[in-house]
Amino acid sequence: MYHKYKNVELVKPSGLELKDRLVSVNRVTKVTKGGRAFGFSAIVVVGDENGVVGHGLGKSKDVSEAIAKAVEDAKKNLVKIPLSGKSVPHEQKGKFGGARVNLMPASHGTGVIAGGAVRSVLESVGIHDVLSKSQGSSNPHNVVKATFDALLQMRSAYTVSRQRGISLEKVFKG
């Protein structure tokens, strides 16, 4: 999933204090000739609240086992997100499936203006001041992936100056 982004820094979970947030648990049913077989799927976001975040999906016949599998999956997908203080560096849009997410920087003290799955991802990253708008599909899995799409497109001012071969001052003042 992350190969289409050039500047994605994959992170190993060892040595990080990761906190996990449960985004959703869904009860699923498989109908067989012997009756119904119930199972659960869980979506979890893990992060160190300092720019490192990952998401995972776990499935099992037991809720706690599904959550544990999701946490393990999330730890395999950790990425580093560039932050601007405790907000996002610039406005960015992300898409996945039918879900679209817009993230906009906010001034200090604004808080996380986001709902559901988007809020879980942003708080796990360590973003404290951001405005967001979620449109289209409200499926938690697609919304989480759309939020990751937006976050992975973010670039810090330093990265932009290096890529363009200009000074950091010129990036800010034009």
Curated annotation (Swiss-Prot):
Residues 18-81 form the S5 DRBM domain. Keywords: Ribonucleoprotein, Ribosomal protein, RNA-binding, rRNA-binding. GO terms for biological process: translation. InterPro entries: Ribosomal_Su5_D2-typ_SF, Ribosomal_uS5, Ribosomal_uS5_bac-type, Ribosomal_uS5_C, Ribosomal_uS5_N, Ribosomal_uS5_N_CS, Ribsml_uS5_D2-typ_fold_subgr. GO terms for molecular function: rRNA binding; structural constituent of ribosome. The N-terminal domain interacts with the head of the 30S subunit; the C-terminal domain interacts with the body and contacts protein S4. The interaction surface between S4 and S5 is involved in control of translational fidelity. Belongs to the universal ribosomal protein uS5 family. Part of the 30S ribosomal subunit. Contacts proteins S4 and S8. This is Small ribosomal subunit protein uS5. It comes from Flavobacterium psychrophilum (strain ATCC 49511 / DSM 21280 / CIP 103535 / JIP02/86). The lineage of its organism: Bacteria, Pseudomonadati, Bacteroidota, Flavobacteriia, Flavobacteriales.
